[in-house]
């Protein structure tokens, strides 16, 4: 029997901060399981979850507004440690009898806080010492309102010149508030503070590791499916690949992977997926060669959202056809990860807006009557990659740049044709190959090539040619919510351009996209 890796757990209540998922990832990195819930949960739900500690996230609202979010009262009577971060500190202070006021001085960015009182939260933690010998911390602030009076049973632990209560604490009740963001890397000792809270104050044991996650997932898969057979749509992407490896470890040949080659993959990608998972790892793979079917369905369609929906629909039809041939199959596996679960919950409550539709086997017909197996649904993407490494998947595959679900269908602008896809595949392969050779691939967050359905005059030898244009795109980003275009060296771009024009017959011009996000999106469609 494996250890219960969920035994010690932290509950994070989300007040809307852009950093809230980062808080959860930091807690997981410490080795402790946590979940992220909306702030307005019931006492019954908290009791049922039985957390070892609670973190109140930051948020964009003002606690001085009458209808602003508040922590459930039970948070402060549950008898477990509580850490309030930014807005979380402000609502803690206000709900426990302190005062919060709006401020004309919005504090955003780097700040240095001076620790004036000892606290379990910052014990033996410092970045420097003040002239008076007091510990100093380099932190990241992002707030307008600030606490102007702390609750009666709290003490001031640290302050800045403009923020008198940068850290407050009630050591007896184990309540702590920080006006900065310990989860961001700009707060240099932030991870150590979170470790103090999670491991020392909440007394959690670090049981959440790649090896124990795999052991737990394998056991749970076996308990869920018993002796039944499972089917999985394998794309070769990170999530479906790790899902396949977990299921293979748990149930072996009772897993059938359906790999649909839609003709919209990268150069040699289909062959690589089949070789790795079929020949090397020994998985049972059904290969569906469906390029003609996808391209026929896409003929004459140039609107991006329509293309996405067609690609998703045809995939579902093909997968359904293959699943119906597998009479023993009782379960459908999906590579759903924790951010998908969070996003779905937000959509269900009307708190999210779909900018681009996602195509997934979640749209499979109800008449298939298959149970659902989602072994990654508790995991963030970085955790999925870590367990992928532990399972023996190659680093280059797990840390490859993101590739859209519809593939080249949204990187060929306008109508998708086989000729365009073939040209784009070869041009993109050259770009990626040169990025690796120049040691630039891992220095950018995402890089790819886009096919533009416009012709441009070129000169080749003594003759002229009238051929297609491609655009190179490379961006740097932390969270893919915002992005800067990558300032790649001119000589590198020149080398890539020359190779594409000389080696890919049919392309006469290469341009480089220098648009940031916003206003542009990272993908062109």
Curated annotation (Swiss-Prot):
Give Gene Ontology CC terms.
Answer: cytosol
- Quote the catalytic activity from the record: XMP + L-glutamine + ATP + H2O = GMP + L-glutamate + AMP + diphosphate + 2 H(+)
Q: Which PROSITE patterns match?
A: GATASE_TYPE_1, GMPS_ATP_PPASE
**Could you tell me which InterPro entries the record lists for this protein?**
Class_I_gatase-like, GATASE, GMP_synth_C, GMP_synth_GATase, GMP_synthase, GMPS_ATP_PPase_dom, NAD/GMP_synthase, Rossmann-like_a/b/a_fold
Question: Which keywords does this Swiss-Prot/TrEMBL entry list?
Answer: ATP-binding, Glutamine amidotransferase, GMP biosynthesis, Ligase, Nucleotide-binding, Purine biosynthesis
This protein's source sits in the domain of life called: Bacteria
Q: Which residues bind ATP?
A: 235-241
Q: Does the keyword Mitochondrion apply?
A: no
Which residue numbers delimit the Glutamine amidotransferase type-1 domain?
9-207
Q: What does this protein do?
A: Catalyzes the synthesis of GMP from XMP.
Record note on quaternary structure: Homodimer.
This one is known as GMP synthase [glutamine-hydrolyzing]
* Organism (species): Serratia proteamaculans (strain 568)
